């Protein structure tokens, strides 16, 4: 298998990422742009602790309504950045969601330098509970909450979906707390109705399933877990969204490029097959020229597929509740 060693890049990334926006290592990112919104809030603390890594930006669609369905979109950074919400695919994924009528929440989360796994999923679940707890203030319609993410953000979105409703799990010999105790809305649910996985590493036990760039002696997942796969495989299973797939998972749509050399496309393909086998509603697109982010991934066709999938799930969910 062809591999390129980038240990120097990893070292530099690890040093600067805690205070820097997501850059190349998190995939292709479009610089911060001005979105068309009716209202927005920046640097809202969702945990009540005054930490920058526990803040989020909230955007409401240009068309004003009493309330909006919600999409939480998480940036990619190989878990190295704790402050990249301002570059969370604003000109592509977030823009499309806003135009489709979704309130969009872009959160920061703790990096692998701030805390080890499962702190990151604790943060994302805190965001979901915050959305429910502060629904009246921000005009959120909590009957539908989707979670989306790119790269490591796709991993967190996928894991939030496949662990839906699971607060603790026994993975081999490891008992993992998936819920956490972050924020002021601990009585709220952290469940989601749908998820979008853009190029996410979802099986951290099999990152060598295809050609990809390696990051020297310590991969991003090694740093996140402070371990090695051959020493503590159960830790890597506990980090893998694929480990938790079952028939109770919400609908999940996957986008993964065939030419992705950061997170190989076989990750998305394995996820897709596992979801189908479990009977989960799922769709997947594997662009032939798609890399890790970039124009071949964020085409109008793919963005429309994402929106159509979420709308179909949302409408079907609404109709089902009406019939009850």
Residue ranges: model-predicted function:
Residues 1-24, 324:
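Bacterial Sec-dependent N-terminal signal peptides
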Residues 20-324:
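Alpha/beta-hydrolase superfamily serine-hydrolase fold, recognizing
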